[in-house]
């Protein structure tokens, strides 16, 4: 069993923020792979399903970004999962918009959701980094991250989310390189 976590902030006012792209990814995966109904558990929203041959739990912490680790830690302990079962989808400033990279472990790069998970569980988890691009100057980062995707970005966002969901079976079976490559190819074809 794997636990896939999407990072974001709860509430409709945050739904289209770049910071919520982790939530968006999980919503798309759940829809494409016909996951079960949403259950309120572990201080978040949980859905159960299968991706390929793997049982996968999708968790969107409802704790706000800065406390995501509480929710994730609770689920990990309940299901007695090791760190190798955890995959976290999050926004990444240091990647070009709509690029997808998978990384094992590492630092938090100032991301409060990652920092919270690291604090509660340690840094050794798989991250699916979803590029939102950098606004160019550090003074503009907060507004960029907490801003909505622009209308002009919607097609690229939908393409990225669809590619992630379509290729999710590769991620579930641990073929991270092919997962990334196939997403990039789908995006080239769509663009």
UniProtKB/Swiss-Prot annotation:
It is found in: Cytoplasm. It comes from Novosphingobium aromaticivorans (strain ATCC 700278 / DSM 12444 / CCUG 56034 / CIP 105152 / NBRC 16084 / F199). GO terms for molecular function: peptidyl-tRNA hydrolase activity; tRNA binding. Belongs to the PTH family. One of its GO terms (biological process) is protein quality control for misfolded or incompletely synthesized proteins. InterPro entries: Pept_tRNA_hydro (IPR001328), Pept_tRNA_hydro_CS (IPR018171), Pept_tRNA_hydro_sf (IPR036416). TRNA binds at residues 14, 64, 66, 112. The record marks 91 as: Stabilizes the basic form of H active site to accept a proton. Coiled coil: none annotated. It comes from the Bacteria. It catalyses: an N-acyl-L-alpha-aminoacyl-tRNA + H2O = an N-acyl-L-amino acid + a tRNA + H(+). It is an enzyme of class 3 (hydrolase). Its EC number is 3.1.1.29. This is Peptidyl-tRNA hydrolase. The record marks 9 as: Discriminates between blocked and unblocked aminoacyl-tRNA. Hydrolyzes ribosome-free peptidyl-tRNAs (with 1 or more amino acids incorporated), which drop off the ribosome during protein synthesis, or as a result of ribosome stalling. PROSITE patterns: PEPT_TRNA_HYDROL_2. Its main location: cytoplasm. Pfam families: Pept_tRNA_hydro. Keywords: Cytoplasm, Hydrolase, RNA-binding, tRNA-binding. The active site is at 19 (proton acceptor). GO terms for cellular component: cytoplasm. Monomer.
């Amino acid at each position: 069993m794997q636990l896939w976590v999407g990072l974001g902030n709860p509430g409709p006012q945050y739904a289209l923020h770049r910071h919520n792209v982790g939530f968006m990814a999980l919503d798309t995966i759940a829809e494409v792979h016909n996951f079960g109904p949403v259950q309120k558990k572990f201080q978040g929203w949980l859905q159960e399903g299968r991706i390929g041959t793997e049982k996968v739990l999708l968790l969107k912490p409802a704790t706000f970004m800065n406390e995501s680790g509480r929710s994730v830690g609770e689920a990990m302990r309940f299901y007695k999962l090791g760190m190798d079962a955890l995959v976290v989808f999050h926004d990444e400033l240091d990647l070009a918009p709509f690029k997808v990279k998978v990384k094992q472990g590492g630092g938090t790069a100032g991301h409060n959701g990652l920092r919270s998970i690291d604090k509660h569980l340690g840094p050794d988890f798989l991250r699916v980094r979803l590029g939102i691009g950098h606004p160019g100057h550090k003074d503009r980062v907060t507004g960029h991250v907490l801003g909505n995707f622009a209308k002009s970005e919607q097609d690229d966002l939908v393409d990225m989310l669809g590619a992630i969901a379509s290729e999710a079976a590769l991620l579930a079976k641990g073929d991270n390189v092919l997962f990334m490559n196939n997403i990039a190819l789908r995006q080239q074809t769509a663009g």
